[in-house]
A protein has these predicted regions:
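N-terminal beta-propeller domains
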Residues: 1-112, 154-159, 163-199, 260, ...
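Catalytic or ion-translocation cores adjacent to nucleophile or general acid/base/metal-coordination motifs
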Residues: 360-397
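Structural signature of eukaryotic scaffold interfaces centered on beta-propeller domains
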Residues: 64-78, 125-139, 271-285, 329-340, ...
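Surface loop/turn motifs at the tips and blade-to-blade linkers of beta-strand repeat domains
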Residues: 61, 271-272, 327-328, 371-375, ...
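Beta-sheet repeat architectures centered on beta-propellers
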Residues: 2-104, 332, 404-694
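Autoprocessing Asn-cyclization modules and mimics
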Residues: 106, 114-118, 157, 166-262, ...
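Short beta-strand elements that form the blades of beta-propeller/WD-repeat-like
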Residues: 80-86, 141-146, 288-291, 335-347, ...
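Residue-level signature of beta-propeller blades and closely related beta-rich strand-turn architectures
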Residues: 149, 294, 349, 357, ...
Length: 694
């Protein structure tokens, strides 16, 4: 039998779909792995243990089981927050909490409370709040919220992070200004009375020769069909006199003959308690846009320029409000809006944008909605912008696509960037992007999978409740996905500039708990508390004895203990305490373990004589190139790295370099290498060199 040596120089393709297991003709095959569980691929090509999770807050008492949402809020270049919204009462109340650098803000508005409640009022067409459909957009110190089943509202930050105002955006107190009008059921009559306009255009008075306006409301239209002229009623002075704004100038100020003009009724505010409310929102070029509403799901509403809550279409001047409906040959309910290179409109049936020639602004007179691709996007998952493109989940929830402008096609295209790893996407619920924070990192897209695998392939079994983590670097054409799991289910994820928050559902002491946690590069366990000098809550001060407290959220759970980089014996938390193996010199960490697995593809050396797929193979030697690693196992064998504690330094040194490992036994058809850890400490694999007997 011959010996073959192979070198895998990186892992920049990530975990490959099992359906591609036989595609040894693809170059991506040789830069991929078969399993990538709880690892993070580096844009340079290596792979590391994923960050651990810092425990932040127990949201169970906020009735988080009813639904939660994480909302990033960037007040300035130096002040960023994460807002947690929970459905405190399914009938009418959302509770908001505010976190700065992982610390819960207290005494909100001087109330002594650590939260702010929003009573949404009467729901439009449902009996319970669906927070998955809560959409939001931010401008300066204000964040606007929409949901088709209750009135839009806004939260505005005050003088500090504990001062917030919560206000309803009221379209009913002055509907002529605040809300656009439309006809749901039209009623047209030709009154038996003359009608005399006071002027041909602008704000005018219309006087009838009989009492025809006694039961007419504002917003209704009057149209002459002898000559021309059309006006919108803005005030009813009496049964014979109304004030109106002309939409089409009248021919003259002469009286229009009886039965020669139409009184068009049925006009009403587009949003109301009987018609529902806006679905989605975004700010774009000085306007607030609402995308769709409960009964007008395909209509785009744009505010007056710099008057964000004025949606009065008025005379159609350049700065007036915009009202445009997607008139297409299929149902296109708007699911999301994004302000990018253009105003992008995502719908259930396809993707649209509003082109702007010569960089002109969008106005009522030049607005044109163009169709680009017909993939459709899933409602409730916000598209994310990354390196000039927009990432979105296809309507069926089975593909991650990138909407990007193509100069060759002079339009947008929607490429499937999850094609090589679609098995990692199962019932997606939320999505967030952490942009590259320095020259050594890439964009990290985090996609939270739901709990319903119905309709998904068998290859997707086991990925419910996980996070599909895509490391992206467009310049290097890197899309490297992995799967992140924890002791429980991930529910939501949000990014506060560079901090990644998540909500995790865990079972603690037999009861369901909902914890807010933060991915932390300095931790190697989940739901972890660290002990060190001058801690930030909820971390604790370094103990002077072997008792580590502050662990009530892990009562009854078996935890891992790391003390000055030394892994102590496992311990079952009792009374909120754990016992350390000694007094720490610098720090200690207590948290839940998570398993790391990296498994290579079946060995295929690409010999001139052909494939070796049908032959048995034996791994003879594996030499990983490691970087700052403290523990690693290869095919269940612990590999000694000579990283012994240094007395007095309070840490274990890391190993960097090549580590030759021999003595692997047994022939298999695949000859795969499984890299894992038996201790929760750091490791990074840059490359693999291995010899196989064929």
């Amino acid at each position: 039998m011959s010996r073959v040596q192979q070198y895998q120089s990186g892992f920049t393709v990530g975990e490959l779909d099992p359906l591609l297991r036989g595609r040894i003709d693809l170059e991506q095959y040789y830069q991929s792995v078969a399993v990538a569980d709880n690892v993070l691929f580096e844009p340079q090509g290596g792979v590391s243990r994923r960050p651990g999770l810092k425990f932040v807050f127990d949201a169970t008492a906020d009735n988080a089981a009813n639904g939660v949402v994480l909302i990033p809020f960037e007040f300035s270049t130096t002040q960023n927050l994460m807002i947690l919204g929970s459905v405190f009462n399914t009938a009418n109340t959302i509770r908001f909490r505010f976190f700065v650098n992982g610390i819960l803000q207290t005494n909100i508005n001087g109330s002594g409370n650590t939260y702010l409640d929003r009573t949404v009022g009467t729901l439009y067409s449902v009996s319970a709040i669906d927070i998955d459909k809560l959409y939001y957009t931010q401008n300066a110190d204000t964040i606007v919220f929409t949901n088709e089943n209750f009135k839009p509202f806004k939260i505005t930050r005050g003088a500090n992070n504990s001062t917030w105002s919560l206000t309803t955006i009221d379209f009913t107190s002055n509907p002529d200004k605040n809300a656009p009008y439309t006809v749901f059921t039209e009623a047209v009559s030709q009154p038996n009375a003359t009608l005399t306009p006071s002027a041909v255009s602008g704000a005018i008075t219309l006087t009838a020769s009989a009492s025809v306006f006694a039961s007419v409301g504002t917003g209704q239209r009057i149209q002459s069909y002898t000559g021309y002229g059309r006006a919108k009623i803005i005030a009813v002075t009496s049964a014979t006199v109304v004030t109106a704004i002309t939409e089409v100038p009248f021919y003259s100020t002469d009286a229009i003959a009886a039965n020669s003009w139409d009184l068009i009724q049925g006009w009403e505010p587009a949003w109301s308690a009987t018609r529902g409310w806006p679905r989605t929102c975004t700010f774009h070029e000085g306007r607030l846009y609402f995308g769709g509403s409960a009964q007008l799901p395909s209509t785009l509403f744009g505010s007056k320029v710099s008057d964000y809550f004025n949606f009065n279409v008025a005379e159609g001047l350049d700065d007036d409000a915009i009202f445009a409906t997607l008139a297409t040959d299929s149902v296109n309910a708007i699911t999301a809006l994004r302000s990018g290179r253009d105003l992008q409109i995502f719908t259930t049936g396809g993707e649209f944008f509003i082109p702007q020639s010569s960089l002109d602004p969008i106005t009522p007179s030049n607005i044109v909605v163009k169709s680009t691709t017909r993939r459709g996007s899933k409602y409730g998952i916000r598209p994310q912008g990354a390196e000039g493109g927009t990432l979105f989940i296809q309507r069926q929830g089975k593909a991650l696509r990138e909407m990007v402008f193509s100069d060759t096609e002079i339009s947008y295209v929607a490429n499937n960037i999850s094609l090589l790893s679609s098995h990692l996407i199962v019932d997606p619920q939320r999505m967030a992007l952490r942009p590259a924070t320095d020259t050594t990192s890439g964009d990290l897209l985090l996609l939270v999978n739901g709990l319903d695998s119905t309709g998904y392939r068998a290859a997707s079994t086991g990925f419910t409740g996980t996070i599909a983590a895509f490391m992206l670097n467009k310049g290097q054409q890197i899309v490297a996905p992995s799967s992140w799991t924890t002791d429980g289910d991930f529910i939501d994820v949000g990014v506060d500039l560079d901090q990644i928050y998540t909500v995790v559902k865990r079972t603690i002491g037999g009861a369901a708990k909902y914890y807010v946690e933060i991915f932390d590069d300095d931790r190697t366990t989940d739901s972890a508390i660290q002990y060190y000098a001058n801690p930030l809550a909820p971390d604790q001060a370094k103990p002077s004895n072997t008792t580590a407290g502050g662990l009530a959220h892990l009562n009854g759970e078996v935890v891992k203990i790391i003390r000055d980089d030394i892994v102590d014996a496992d311990f079952t938390v009792s009374g909120g305490n754990a016992t350390l193996g000694g007094v720490p010199s610098v720090y200690a960490e207590v948290g839940l373990n998570y398993t790391v697995t990296l498994k290579t593809q079946p060995f295929e050396p690409r010999l001139p004589s052909g494939t070796v797929a049908s032959q048995k193979r034996r791994i003879l030697e594996v030499t990983p190139r490691l970087y700052r690693s403290q523990n690693i196992t290869i095919n269940s064998r612990n590999i000694p790295l000579q990283t012994l504690p240094i007395s007095g330094l309070g840490k274990v040194p890391t190993f960097t370099g090549l580590k030759k490992t021999q003595g692997f036994l047994g022939y298999t058809r695949d000859a795969q290498i499984t890299i894992s850890q038996d201790q929760p400490v750091f490791f990074t694999v840059l490359a693999l060199d291995y010899k196989v007997s064929v």
